Amino acid sequence: MSGGISGAQKHIKEKALIAYYVHCYGHKLNLVLTSVAKNVPQASEFFSLLEEVYIFASNAVVHEKFLSIQREMFPEEQIRELQHLSDTRWCCQATSCDKALLRLECIIRLLKETSADDTGARAASARGLLAQMDAEFVCLLQFFFEILRKINKVSQQLQDKQADLGKAAKLISCLREDLADVRNSNLIENYSNRVDDLCKNVTFHQQ
């Protein structure tokens, strides 16, 4: 309930003097995620790179090539479009990690073919992106996919019209406990095999 000067908060308090300000838990969760991402260098750089890949693949010529590669490599599966990132809607980050993970092989192939077949700025951009997409990138992609999937589930529940303050507080508390368990567990070891398999399937740099 924002707008303490002239918005909804002020008008409600004129009618109900004991009403108190409650920040939207869904928005509050987004603010925390945004702050963390901006203040952790690895996270900030990772999501910046993910956005650069999205922008690159959105070019009309490149986009058509990306779709063609998907049809060839995954003929029986649905085409996946990469997701634009947003500071205010972190479900976009979760979706972006999900789709990038599913189509990582296609993305790497797209960058390789563009850097080899194109000329000028587009080829240079492809080589620049490809040089940054290494085993660490894959590890972070898998890590954020796992973490953001948990957070996104809670974010969606917070948007439920029937949710009240008590339910919101309980959801956030459970999420904090879940993330603490992840931090204290061997999460990296648990999915290291998946990361290793991805790295084996993808040769990042041109020989």
Task: Please state what every model-predicted region is.
Residues 1-207:
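Alpha-helical structural modules in large enzymes and assemblies
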